[in-house]
Amino acid sequence: MNLAAMDPTTYDAQLEAKRIKLEQAFAQFETPSIEVFASDPEHYRMRAEFRVWHEGDDLYYYMFDKALNDKVRCDQYLPASTLINEMMAALIAELKPNPSLRHKLFQVDFLSTLSGEILVSLLYHRQLDDQWRAEAIALKAKLSSQFKVNIIGRARKQKIDLDKDFVVESLQVNDKVFHYKQIENSFTQPNAKVAIKMLEWAIDVTQNSQGDLLELYCGNGNFSIALAQNFNRVLATELAKPSVDAAQYNIEINGIDNLQIIRMSAEEFSDAMAKKRSFRRLEGIDLDSYLCNTIFVDPPRAGIDPATLDLVQGYERILYISCNPDTLKDNLQQLYKTHKVTRFALFDQFPYTDHMETGVLLERIK
């Protein structure tokens, strides 16, 4: 974190610098003009994590500033949502005078939503007992007069949910509202308004699609649920069980009837498609019945592994969302031999950092 860089007056210049850097880095692929999707310059992050400092009777949040090489007190935090900032103040006021709730508390995590829900996780260097639970229940009751809040307590090999360990986000995407279960301690897009722009862009570039869609690394179904409207059927894979469970929940609450989630890794799915291995998890699913002309990938920072990249290259159209331009560039070295980049986007998920989220649509060269 570099707090000095978080200056809304410099936001536009910082975003333009990212665009230029991206354009230069991908010039060899003859990309079209970059479509740039800006963030709000402040209060854009829907989640935030803070360490907690104890100093006599005082108690406050802090972060480590790499530029200063020191901890920085954070009574408020410009990138965090307005809801998180409001909760930060209300929560610390309740924790300070409470010996049970503050004892060996070392971290607080916040997960907020545009829909108004917020989840607070309190992390401790001690085991949590019945007294802690009673005090946490009272804390939740008091905060609930102002917030739609749930509280979780965590310690080594211990997790206490007072009610539930998730929030439900609602995103207005074009003329539809999609609802997403977001689980504590699982991956979610941190910048909800930019996430909406990403979904709208993905829907736009896949309009008038033929056949079915295959998605790898689908997470909680964020993209596949929104894209289902553009395809006859969608087949999606995800390895993490909490994400698969959330995806199934999201499919149901959004009334999606043409989306099938399979719990397996991209590498395992590549083997299944190549008929190298059989999997019990695929019983009852006829892979050969899917006519997938389009594949959607949103891989981790490491990019796509070689075997999966070979699989991806076999599709007519490839929609690739990347959180790491370096590994995207590496993957394009192979994909560019058979496909042309026809759409290219920069999504500023993380203002005031070097991080760039990108999207490319590749279409097979005729």
From Swiss-Prot:
PROSITE patterns: SAM_MT_RNA_M5U, TRMA_1, TRMA_2. GO terms for biological process: tRNA methylation. It is an enzyme of class 2 (transferase). GO terms for molecular function: rRNA binding; tRNA (uracil(54)-C5)-methyltransferase activity, S-adenosyl methionine-dependent; tRNA binding. It comes from Shewanella oneidensis (strain ATCC 700550 / JCM 31522 / CIP 106686 / LMG 19005 / NCIMB 14063 / MR-1). SUPFAM superfamilies: S-adenosyl-L-methionine-dependent methyltransferases. One of its GO terms (cellular component) is cytosol. S-adenosyl-L-methionine binds at Q189, Y217, N222, E238, D298. Belongs to the class I-like SAM-binding methyltransferase superfamily. RNA M5U methyltransferase family. TrmA subfamily. Pfam families: tRNA_U5-meth_tr. Dual-specificity methyltransferase that catalyzes the formation of 5-methyluridine at position 54 (m5U54) in all tRNAs, and that of position 341 (m5U341) in tmRNA (transfer-mRNA). Keywords: Methyltransferase, S-adenosyl-L-methionine, Transferase, tRNA processing. This is tRNA/tmRNA (uracil-C(5))-methyltransferase. The active site is at C323, E357. Transmembrane segments: none annotated. Its EC number is 2.1.1.-, 2.1.1.35. It catalyses: uridine(54) in tRNA + S-adenosyl-L-methionine = 5-methyluridine(54) in tRNA + S-adenosyl-L-homocysteine + H(+); uridine(341) in tmRNA + S-adenosyl-L-methionine = 5-methyluridine(341) in tmRNA + S-adenosyl-L-homocysteine + H(+).
